[in-house]
Amino acid sequence: MAKKYINDVRFWLLAIIIFGGGFALHPSVGLSILDFPSLRVGLYQIVAVSLLLFSLPLLLKKRQELLKNRWLIGGFLAIFIAITVGIFFAEARLRTALYSLSLLFLLAVGLSAGLIYSELSKSKKRKLINVGLWSGLVFGILAIIQLTVATFEPTGLGTLCAGCKADVFGFPRINLFAAEPQFFANSLLPAFFLALFQSKSRLAKFSLFFTTIAISLTFSRGGFLSIFIAITALFIIAFVKRIDASFIRKKLPIIFAGLLFGFALLFSSDRKSVV
């Protein structure tokens, strides 16, 4: 009974993590300590900590298997060395240390999520995939709504800071509940690639279209670069290993349509603000 309860809690925590990446900033409260205004604790961070704590038994159970994974250990070791060197040479060591701890925490949550996912049944894995697809669809629609509202009426919802309006940047900056557009675009990448690999799902096609629109509305170079590099790498791997990548080529028109539609919305918003 207790094991089933723990497994259910793990599943729902992972579902929230997958769906709620766009809520990385709000709702949250700022911690006015260490002269670090960006230090905040929010609902999403609490869920992430809970996921990490509930995964500890799995980490202990599979510790031998994890320690034998050279790529995993080598990757963590390289990151740890880079962080140590970075802190040593940084001018603001405390701030660099806090950012570094955030990165390590993110990696630990990713490892925990992977372990929990590997323990799920096929039906629950399918449910999580659908959660990710719905995340892309919902946040894509919300991004369009934010753009529309910010175009016709300046609003504080989801803006970067007080006074960060469309008339300052020239067009609305779409970030919804994330700290900035770049972070919002990054939070949509899991939904984007989930939709890309679901070849026979109508939900996946809608999710891919609206996720692409949302990423284009952020005007995030990092988001565009991540998608371009990942798709290029997939085609190279498929060519070298002679893997059928036709399902990716079939999704490219959806991606291009989403980008064009998103840029058209941004252009229309810019013209509206000028008028």
State where each predicted segment sits.
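Membrane-interfacial loop-to-transmembrane alpha-helix junctions, especially the N-terminal start
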Residues: 6-17, 64-78, 125-132, 203-204
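Juxtamembrane membrane-water interface segments that cap and precede transmembrane helices
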Residues: 24-38, 162-177
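Membrane-embedded alpha-helical segments of multi-pass membrane proteins
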Residues: 38-57, 100-110, 183-192, 225-232
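Alpha-helical transmembrane segments of multi-pass inner-membrane proteins
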Residues: 81-87, 126-159, 166-170, 175-241
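A membrane-periplasm/extracellular boundary helix in multi-pass inner-membrane enzymes
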Residues: 141, 147-150, 235-275
